[in-house]
Structure formats: structure tokens, C-alpha cells
Design a protein with these regions (language model features):
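Short beta-strand and adjoining strand-loop segment in the mid-core
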Residues: 40, 71-80, 119-128
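Adenosine-phosphate binding glycine-rich loop
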Residues: 10, 114-156
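ADP-ribose/adenylate-binding Rossmann-like module
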Residues: 73-77, 84-109
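A short, aliphatic-rich alpha-helical micro-motif
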Residues: 11, 67-69
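A structured beta-alpha segment of the ubiquitous adenosine-cofactor-binding alpha/beta core
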Residues: 61-67
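Short glycine-rich, flexible loops that bind phosphorylated cofactors or substrates
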Residues: 66, 82-84
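Hydrophobic, well-ordered beta-alpha structural blocks that scaffold small-molecule cofactor pockets
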Residues: 1-53, 58-61
Length: 156
């Protein structure tokens, strides 16, 4: 298997489709805030938090292949592995797909992100251990602003 290559993407005016409406789909959608992406959620139902996101379009339906035909980035984020695999199989080779139920089937992974002013740090286990990534992000979040402040004083 090849190693993952880290990137920062400009998603302004890009189409992002999230298939699923639960907590994981919500986390993916909330991470897209302020990106300028056109975010569409495909799911018969969505969690209450998702309903509060003003930048999403919700299509209240089950997944069909046509739902992702124009997508640049796709999250298969349902609680049903078979549906997630249907999404993966329906995608074209040029589309980037994240299968939340099986990282080995994903063409990209969303890292943990820490933002402070104009600085961004991402943390990843290349999809192998998302819960560890989350714990590491939580630990580093409190340290990061102090570190930036300290380094900026010594590198002026």
C-alpha cells in the first residue's frame, strides 16, 4: 500500500456530497464550514445538529448513483457499510471518496485540524486509527496557541 500524501484543498465552489445524516456525517459537514464548498447531504434523515448548518443542502432521500455524478469530494458516511460501499463503487476514478466504515477503501482521509489565527496543523493516522487522531488533536489543541505565541517571539 502507498503512503498517503497530505494536502490542503481549496474547495471554494466545489461540490461536496455527504451520504449519511448521523453524527459522523455531521462532523464531516461541520468541518466544511467557511470553505465555500457546495455541500449536499443525501439521507432520509439527519441529526438535529446537521439541521442547524446553514451552508448545507439536504436531499431527504436514499442514495442513488446520480447523487454523486457532479461531486468533487464524496463522504460515504452512513451507518451501513453496504451503502458506503455502493457509494464508493458508484464514484468515478477522478472523484475523491472517503468511506468512513473502511479507511482502506478511501482515496482520502480527513485529518484532525487545529486552527489558530492563520496557522493550521493537521493530524492523521492515515485512516488507521481515527479515535487516536481525535485524542491527539484534543491534547494538542490546548498546547498549540501557547507554542505559536512562544515561537513568534523568538522568530521575529
Amino acid at each position: 500500500m502507498y503512503n498517503m500524501y497530505p494536502l490542503m484543498l481549496n474547495l471554494n465552489k466545489k461540490v461536496v456530497v455527504i451520504v449519511g445524516g448521523g453524527k459522523i456525517a455531521y462532523r464531516k459537514a461541520s468541518g466544511l464550514k467557511d470553505t465555500g464548498a457546495f455541500v449536499t447531504i443525501i439521507s432520509p434523515e439527519i441529526c438535529e445538529e446537521m439541521k442547524e448548518l446553514p451552508y448545507i443542502t439536504w436531499k431527504q432521500k436514499t442514495f442513488s448513483n446520480d447523487d454523486i455524478k457532479d461531486a468533487h469530494l464524496i463522504y460515504a458516511a452512513t451507518n451501513q457499510h453496504a451503502v458506503n460501499m455502493m457509494v464508493k463503487q458508484a464514484a468515478h476514478d477522478f472523484q475523491w471518496v472517503n468511506v468512513v466504515s473502511d479507511g482502506t477503501k478511501s482515496s482520502f482521509h480527513t485529518p484532525g485540524v487545529i486552527r489558530h489565527d492563520e496557522y493550521i496543523v493537521t493530524i492523521s493516522t492515515s485512516g488507521k486509527n481515527p479515535s487516536y487522531t481525535k485524542r491527539l488533536k484534543q491534547a494538542l489543541t490546548s498546547i498549540f496557541p501557547k507554542l505559536i505565541k512562544k515561537l513568534s517571539r523568538t522568530h521575529k
